[in-house]
Amino acid sequence: MTIKGGVVSQDFSAAFSTVACEPAGVVWNKVCTVLKRELGDAAFGSWIAPAVLREGPSGDVVVVTPTGIARDWIRRSAWRRVSELWTANDATGRRLDLKSRLEFESVGGAGYEAKAEPIEIVLPVSSDVPALAPTNGSKPSPVQGLQERFTFDTFVPGPANEFAHAVARRVASWADGHFNPVLFHGPYGFGKTHLLNALAWEAMRQAPTKRVVYLTAERFLSTFVRAVMDRQTAAFKEELRGADLLIIDDVHFIAGKQSSQEELFHTLTALVEDGRRVVFSSDRAPAAMTEMDARLRSHLSAGLVCGLEPADRALRIGILERKLQALSRQHGFEPTLRAEVLNFLADRFTDSVRELEGALNTLSARAGEGVSRLTLEEVQAILRPHLRAGEKRITIDDIQKATSEHYGMKQVDLLSERRNRAIARPRQAAMWLAKQLTTRSLPDIGRRFGGRDHTTVLHAVRRIEALRADDPVLSQDLETITRKLRG
């Protein structure tokens, strides 16, 4: 019989087969109904609902909390009332005890948890404590802080992230010979959180009995501060250091927080020395975290540091196509975009995968099933209000200067009548960039390139569009110039 995530499941037929009485799950259900009413949804959901009812080593019934902090709160604030309600509802007088998960396992608590159809008590569950993987092998609940959509199946690997992806896969498989700790770093929106979530899900799937703790650095800070205020730091340490795999997202947030850095340093040291796995993410490499404690920074550098690079164009298109498939499953529309729309999104949103996916979400929300019929002009109109705030306005003159500098030529050459390839190809690239990065019409672009007509510009745009798919050098040139222009 189990209570997990606010749902009670009961079947004590094996543990209490000789006792003609109400199943323990039914009794606990009655207790929880009263406690929820008396404590309120927030307190009940935070402290009581995450508990698990287990059979103790001597046949008693034990309320097992996921953390020592939760155990101490229940003992201090609610245990007297819990005991009263249990006694009043259990006619056979079964003894009820309270232990944290580590306590229960250390005294040889039964690993048996009987299962049956659940008696539902749907309650809000707090995520203020570190999230532990369930010991019964069931899929963890989203309230643990993990997002179900972030898995290896939905992660799109490419040159920018394939090494980090391979490392995450290896850690999740519990393979021997891993580096420890592992730190993934890269700017906001590069896929770090997705990778860490995927790693956690896969690690729990591969080894259901292992203990996995996933939390953000902000959660680490807030939980540690609360533990200090409640004088529960020992319980806090107990929970983190009992993990087989500890994952902390955005560890750079801890920099400058002296006591929290100290605690993380000792936790990291203890876990690594004990052969447990530790994984972090941050927005920069350890060497660049100058405000972080030197000892902690050194430990973060001591394992394997994996950088995630900006997604290249092919990877961005792959991400868009995978996202389209997900949207089609959710909403039932045809998972396609016009080629010019797909290319526009991949070329326009180059700095962050989140921005890229956000643009597609916006189109889906606005157009619904009609998203596959949107023209480039309609897409540009829809996304115009959603472009990055304060983005630098790029002019055709900016494009001409950046292109000529990149190719080592004079800007005046782009405006000349010269047609040799060394000049014609950069000129076509600059025209293509002008079409992508400005709102100027084709005739206007032509006028600013030495008075050419719009058909010349259209030919240049189509030529570059066709070439860059098969010419990685040209594709990289366009990306480099674009990044320089956007600064």
From Swiss-Prot:
Keywords: ATP-binding, Cytoplasm, DNA replication, DNA-binding, Lipid-binding, Nucleotide-binding. The keyword Cytoplasm applies. One of its GO terms (cellular component) is plasma membrane. InterPro entries: AAA+_ATPase (IPR003593), Chromosome_initiator_DnaA (IPR001957), Chromosome_initiator_DnaA-like (IPR020591), Chromosome_initiator_DnaA_CS (IPR018312), DnaA_C (IPR013159), DnaA_dom (IPR013317), DnaA_N_dom (IPR024633), DnaA_N_sf (IPR038454). Transmembrane segments: none annotated. Gene3D superfamilies: 1.10.1750.10, 1.10.8.60, 3.30.300.180, P-loop containing nucleotide triphosphate hydrolases. It is found in: Cytoplasm. Pfam families: Bac_DnaA, Bac_DnaA_C, DnaA_N. It comes from the Bacteria. Residues 145-367 are annotated as: Domain III, AAA+ region. One of its GO terms (biological process) is regulation of DNA replication. GO terms for molecular function: ATP binding; ATP hydrolysis activity; DNA replication origin binding; lipid binding. Residues 368-487 are annotated as: Domain IV, binds dsDNA. ATP binds at G189, G191, K192, T193. Plays an essential role in the initiation and regulation of chromosomal replication. ATP-DnaA binds to the origin of replication (oriC) to initiate formation of the DNA replication initiation complex once per cell cycle. Binds the DnaA box (a 9 base pair repeat at the origin) and separates the double-stranded (ds)DNA. Forms a right-handed helical filament on oriC DNA; dsDNA binds to the exterior of the filament while single-stranded (ss)DNA is stabiized in the filament's interior. Oligomerizes as a right-handed, spiral filament on DNA at oriC. Belongs to the DnaA family. This is Chromosomal replication initiator protein DnaA. It comes from Caulobacter sp. (strain K31). The gene is dnaA.
